[in-house]
UniProtKB/Swiss-Prot annotation:
Mg(2+) 1 binds at D171, D175. This is Solanesyl diphosphate synthase 1, chloroplastic. It is found in: Plastid, Chloroplast. Belongs to the FPP/GGPP synthase family. Keywords: Chloroplast, Isoprene biosynthesis, Magnesium, Metal-binding, Plastid, Stress response, Transferase, Transit peptide. Higher expression in leaves than in roots. The lineage of its organism: Eukaryota, Viridiplantae, Streptophyta, Embryophyta, Tracheophyta. Optimum pH is 8.0. Mg(2+) 2 binds at D171, D175. Induction: Induced by high light conditions. One of its GO terms (biological process) is plastoquinone biosynthetic process. NCBIfam families: prenyl_cyano (TIGR02749). Its EC number is 2.5.1.85, 2.5.1.29.
Amino acid sequence: MMTSCRNIDLGTMMMACGCGRRQFPSLAKTVCKFTSSNRSYGGLVGSCKAVPTKSKEISLLNGIGQSQTVSFDLKQESKQPISLVTLFELVAVDLQTLNDNLLSIVGAENPVLISAAEQIFGAGGKRMRPGLVFLVSHATAELAGLKELTTEHRRLAEIIEMIHTASLIHDDVLDESDMRRGKETVHELFGTRVAVLAGDFMFAQASWYLANLENLEVIKLISQVIKDFASGEIKQASSLFDCDTKLDEYLLKSFYKTASLVAASTKGAAIFSRVEPDVTEQMYEFGKNLGLSFQIVDDILDFTQSTEQLGKPAGSDLAKGNLTAPVIFALEREPRLREIIESEFCEAGSLEEAIEAVTKGGGIKRAQELAREKADDAIKNLQCLPRSGFRSALEDMVLYNLERID
């Protein structure tokens, strides 16, 4: 894989294309090339060539003129593990305001609905989706010359978290989950009927606030996400224990269930910054690739982490017949795995045998490569943004996800 970038303004700070060096404070143009054998951003090896501002780009392309070259291996750099606390430091105030507003925004008059909302919001959560909205909002606002975030940026983050929360309530009902983030789920506390109504109410309330943004492009974008949620659930339900499920079908289902909301979040943030359409599209692709990478990593962890780490039994997706990337890859090399799955684990110990076959058949390794491939694509999508702390935080979000399987 080769990524090339030309004619990048350096100023006095950092270079683009993932090169955060300060070696060239008086130079203004670079050609950066990165190569990778394993397609992982963390494994990129590259070099940057910088020339004085007065040199013309054509001389760079032809290798003419005075220049100096610095080679570096990003894989060799020592870097502390990325935590969510440090990841969202730049938008901590924005996220605190969002947390303070969430319950009042739900605004339910029915005490049961209020209790349900308090249960799900009070359970905490990483607030990753609104965090992404704020990071992209700040990064693109800089590009558009905005001094601060708009009311629309902030309302979008709140709407996204409400939609995500509503989807979790419904997911817990469908999956019959009794715990969420260490707390009892809404349907476990209040019953299935109240949980379904609470999720419906939150979707409706989010839609009302969405309509009040009065931006048709964003309204269509977010409305499509709600449709995608349903499409993803139907796709999953109709393909349980189906060993002929293709990787493309898995990725489409993962887009519907996970990446669609992330992509809409990042694109919506860019739209409200009023940047050029090509930038908003790159932000959509960034969200899509990041969302897919996250889902693939989650599906890997279902096999590699313990029940205590997962908060649910290991291999629980497989046990329900939900075939994810590691299983799809392993099925190509392990005929016995097909037999076990199609029997729906009717024999004692068959689930444990299937989990072992997934690892033995190279399913975990190939799924890791796929997650890194999507991560690489996400990093490339960010190259349209000016180098800033906010862009660096978005890059770190990609790396944070990959660190979960390193």
